[in-house]
């Protein structure tokens, strides 16, 4: 059965320039309403960010798609996500690559996301409660790193965990934030500014 809301959202994403069909298929397969509170279920397929509690949000579908597309993933990519949040972005990634590592600083959110992902029968994901600024050193290096909260500057620890030829996509800034792509080439880092965005801040440390 075709879900009209999903198809409408996918059409909007195509109009906004999203071209990766594998990505669009993944977004079609992942039920966004599974990752939000019942009070916001009627807005699950609106192209907007929604609150998930504890001062955090589930990102606007366009931003999820844009950031994922910029990673230029292939099935064998080793991916690190900083900021598991609701688990929605994690689920999209899990449909595209063999394995995803995801770090969340808020224990309650990490537990909730882990439960949701298990209910969707997604088992190619490792989650960890920890400080996103530090990444996940023992699992690196990574071909792709996606950061779903905004640090004021690019964390050096994450740059160090990016493999040769790898790509990191993240929002950077305080009051004025810009979606940024970092590519590691021959031991150097090429940094590109993509577009203006608005994210919650990437807070240091972890919260029980």
From Swiss-Prot:
This is Protein-L-isoaspartate O-methyltransferase. Its main location: cytoplasm. One of its GO terms (biological process) is protein repair. NCBIfam families: pimt (TIGR00080), PRK00312.1 (NF001453). It catalyses: [protein]-L-isoaspartate + S-adenosyl-L-methionine = [protein]-L-isoaspartate alpha-methyl ester + S-adenosyl-L-homocysteine. It holds the Pfam family PCMT. One of its GO terms (molecular function) is protein-L-isoaspartate (D-aspartate) O-methyltransferase activity. The active site is at 59. One of its GO terms (cellular component) is cytoplasm. It is found in: Cytoplasm. Catalyzes the methyl esterification of L-isoaspartyl residues in peptides and proteins that result from spontaneous decomposition of normal L-aspartyl and L-asparaginyl residues. It plays a role in the repair and/or degradation of damaged proteins. Keywords: Cytoplasm, Methyltransferase, S-adenosyl-L-methionine, Transferase.
């Amino acid at each position: 059965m075709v879900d009209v809301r999903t198809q409408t959202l996918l059409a909007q994403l195509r109009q906004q320039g999203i071209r990766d069909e594998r990505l669009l298929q993944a977004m079609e397969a992942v039920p966004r309403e599974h990752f939000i509170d019942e009070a916001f279920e009627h807005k699950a397929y609106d192209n907007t960010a929604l609150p998930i509690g504890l001062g955090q949000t589930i990102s606007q579908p366009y931003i999820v798609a844009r950031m994922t597309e910029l990673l230029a993933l292939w099935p064998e990519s080793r991916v690190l996500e900083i900021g598991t949040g609701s688990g929605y972005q994690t689920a999209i990634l899990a449909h595209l690559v063999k394995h995803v590592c995801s770090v969340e600083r808020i224990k309650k959110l990490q537990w909730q996301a882990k439960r949701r992902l298990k209910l969707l029968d997604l088992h190619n994901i490792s989650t960890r409660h920890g400080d996103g600024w530090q990444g996940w050193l023992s699992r690196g290096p990574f071909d792709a790193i996606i950061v779903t909260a905004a640090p004021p500057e690019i964390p050096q620890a994450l740059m160090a965990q990016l493999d040769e030829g790898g790509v990191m996509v993240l929002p950077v800034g305080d009051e004025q934030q810009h979606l940024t792509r970092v590519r590691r080439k021959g031991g150097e880092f090429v940094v590109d500014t993509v577009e203006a965005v608005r994210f919650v801040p990437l807070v240091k440390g972890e919260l029980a």
